[in-house]
Amino acid sequence: MDYRWIQMKVITFSIAKGGTGKTIITANAAAALAKKGKKILLIDGDVGSKSLSHLLNVKSNIFLADIIEEERPIKDAIVNTPIENIELLAVGKSLADYLKFDINILKRFKELGDYDYVFIDAPSTSSGVETYLALGLSDYFIPVLDYTAFGPSLQGAINTIVIGKNYLESTPAGFIINKAEDLPESVINDIKKILGLECISIIHKNSLVEQSYAKKEIVYLTSSDKKFVEEIDKIVDALEKLKEVKERDIPKVIEKIKESTLL
């Protein structure tokens, strides 16, 4: 049986460690798409920091876990954000806890057929149940490499690609280098060869962008950094070129995750 979320591209920006800008990239890419009239659902799956909710200055009183347990419509847990065309769904529990629910709950996401994109913001690790589930539910994922911690970040990206592509049947759509300095073309080409992916965007280290999380500011909408805006536009162009995935065997993927974690 097909459990896919109708007429949506489901995407995760993945990264191996926290504090490297994954949430900022997710929110700004969503804002850029929303500005073009696309409808976006952001799933804040990071229970610990609630990063997307913080950045967008949104507070949820009803969570996905609540509506599943109480058998309420999923839309009851979705809240508006200050940005037109962007809505947010907070999970309320660790993503790992959702593996204990009946797989048939995924059918209820058919209610959400009016979005163009779903972005899942999961905890920042290259392994673990939360990462596996976010990748498993995503049609595509984009590894984000932190240039200021390049060695661990590159290894994390390699791990994520191996698991996401070969085990969880999600497709890597390219990679992003974040907090970069000026990079020789030879270095970028080496990374392409190692990961087997194209480079979508190189976002240079910028204190204005890094401080935007604390300030709860979406830099793309303020146009306060033209280079950053240009790089987000490159990401959006790549996302718009991705083909819609017609069918995925999500129950099979979920079972793989359960088996690997002994749940």
UniProtKB/Swiss-Prot annotation:
UniProt keyword Nucleotide-binding, yes or no: yes
Protein name (record): Uncharacterized ATP-binding protein MJ0924
Protein transport found in the keyword field: no
Record-listed ATP binding positions: A16, K17, G18, G19, T20, G21, K22, T23
Alphabetic keyword roster: ATP-binding, Nucleotide-binding
Disulfide bonds: none
Pfam families cross-referenced by the UniProt entry: AAA_31 (PF13614)
UniProt-listed InterPro entries: AAA_dom, P-loop_NTPase, ParA/MinD_ATPase
Species annotation: Methanocaldococcus jannaschii (strain ATCC 43067 / DSM 2661 / JAL-1 / JCM 10045 / NBRC 100440) (Methanococcus jannaschii)
